[in-house]
């Protein structure tokens, strides 16, 4: 599963204290989106000016602390993130297996007070439907309360 953000939230994304997973990818491009970094299914290259190094881009897209995104658009290999492990440039999401998600949830189960549990949100959660469904089934087997936030336009 492609997850671009995760963390605990109390009663905003469902009842009680919840572990919220923001899933990468959305089929809409709403101008008011609270999580625009989660829109593109393939992810977005994120830059941190405090840590960026010009030398990680062989195409000259980085000058000082600025990134010329017009150069990035044509880049196929993204050497800045595939060949360099740096805080300066990174992909907007991390990959997790369903089992890794379930293990993390079970390790944090004591935090689900006041009817809490897990919420999957986005992006649009149904863009990763198979992984989402498998996660929901496995969490239900462990009696974890689940919720999804969806725009209801994808499936």
Walk through the language-model features, giving the residues of each:
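Conserved Radical SAM active-site core
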Residues: 40-155
């Amino acid at each position: 599963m492609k997850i671009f953000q995760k963390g605990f939230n109390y009663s905003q994304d469902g009842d009680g204290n919840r572990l919220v997973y923001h899933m990468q990818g959305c089929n809409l491009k709403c101008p008011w989106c609270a999580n625009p970094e989660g829109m593109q299914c393939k992810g977005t290259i994120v830059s941190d000016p405090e840590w960026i190094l010009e030398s990680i881009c062989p195409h000259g897209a980085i000058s000082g602390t600025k990134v010329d995104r017009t150069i990035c658009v044509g880049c196929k290999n993204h050497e800045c993130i595939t060949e360099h492990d740096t805080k300066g440039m990174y992909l907007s999401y991390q990959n997790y297996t369903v089992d890794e998600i379930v293990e993390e949830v079970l390790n944090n189960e004591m935090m689900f007070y006041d009817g809490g549990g897990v919420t999957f949100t986005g992006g649009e959660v149904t863009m990763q439907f198979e992984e989402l469904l498998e996660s929901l089934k496995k969490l239900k087997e462990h009696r974890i309360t689940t919720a999804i936030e969806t725009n209801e336009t994808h499936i």
